[in-house]
Amino acid sequence: MTEDSNHIDIVAAPGVFADLQTAQELVARALSARGLSGGIVDAATGSDEVVVVPGDGAQVDTSLYSSVVRVDFGQCPPDRSENIRAHIRGRGLDGLRFAIDSVYFHRFHPGTIVTYGDHPEQRVELRVPEGDGPFPVAVLIHGGYWRSRWEFDLMDAMAVDLTARGYATWNVEYRRPDEHGWDTTTGDVAAALAALETAPASLDLSRIVLMGHSAGGQLALRLTADSVDERVAPALALSLAGVLDLKVGDERWLGEGAVSNAIGARYAEARRIYEESSPMSRLPLGVPQLVVSAVGDDPNLLEISRAYYAAASAASDSVASVEGPGGHFAVVDPTSEIWVDIVAAVDAALM
C-alpha cells in the first residue's frame, strides 16, 4: 500500500452521531484492523473512494467523489444514485466498520461485477486467481436472515481468501424476500448459479462448491436439491451455520421471526412452501455435503446443524461435519481457527 492508497475518509454530515467519540473509536479500530489510515472528516481530502454518512433522507452530491460507499444507520430504501458503489443501510453505527471493509476489499482486492438479470441486485462479484485455469469455482451465498440490510459484502473476506487459494469465487447478490418476496429470492439464486455457464473466465464447472452462510446455507442446500438435473450443478455443498430446518426455525422464532417474515407465513399456514424450501425436508440431496458449525454459535443453529447431519447420514447422503471454536461469523472468517478445517475439507473434495 502507498501512503495515499491506504487512506480512507469518512465524510459525515453534522449531527449524524449521537456521540462522536464512540464513532471515532469504532472507525479507528476498523481502520487499524485493515492497516489503513483515515478518520471522520467534514470533507474528503483525496480522489479515492470515500465513505459518506449524509444523515437520514439526505442526498449525496456524488459529483464530488469518484466513488462512494453510503452509510445510513437506520433502515431506508437503497440509494442507486450514480457513483454510489455500495449502500450500507440498517446496520446501526457498526455500518461504519462494514463500509471501511467494503472500501478495503474493493480497493485492494477488486472483483468484476457480472449481472444475471435486469434488477440492480441481480449481480455477482467474480474474482479469478492468477494463472490460466480452468479454475474450480466457489459460489458464495450470503446470509442475514433473508433481510435486505445484509448484502454480499459479508462474504468479501472469504472470497478474497479462496481466490488466493486457487478458486474462482462467484459471490452472489440476490433480491431478498422482505422487499421482493420468497419466490423472487429462490429464483435469483438459481439464476445466479446457471449464469456460470456464460461467466467471463476460464472455469471448471465440474468442480463447483456451493457455500452458504446462515440463511444462505438454507438457500445453498435448497438450490443443491433443485439443481441435481441441471446443466450447472454443485459437486459439493456447504452449510456454514445454516438454517437447515425451516419448521424448527419458525417454531423457535429464530431471528425474531425471520423465517416466517421471509416466507410470508408461519409453517402451519404454508406447509408446502416450507417443505419445498427446507433442506431437512429435501433429504436425500444426492450431492456430497459438508455441514459446518461453530460451537459458540446460537445453540439453536448448532442443534439444527447436528440434527441435519444425522438425518442426511441416515438418508445415505455423502455428508461430513466440521465443528470448531467461535461464534456465528467464525465460519466465514479466514482468520478463524475453524476456517483452516473448512478449506482443508473443500480442497480434499475438489482440488
List PLM regions with ranges.
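Short alpha-helix in the alpha/beta-hydrolase fold that links the catalytic acid
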Residues: 23-25, 301-311
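Catalytic nucleophile-loop/oxyanion-hole region of alpha/beta-hydrolase
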Residues: 150-159, 170-207
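Gly/Ala-rich beta-loop-alpha elbow adjacent to hydrolase catalytic centers
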Residues: 212-216, 220
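Hydrolase active-site cap/lid region
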Residues: 222-270
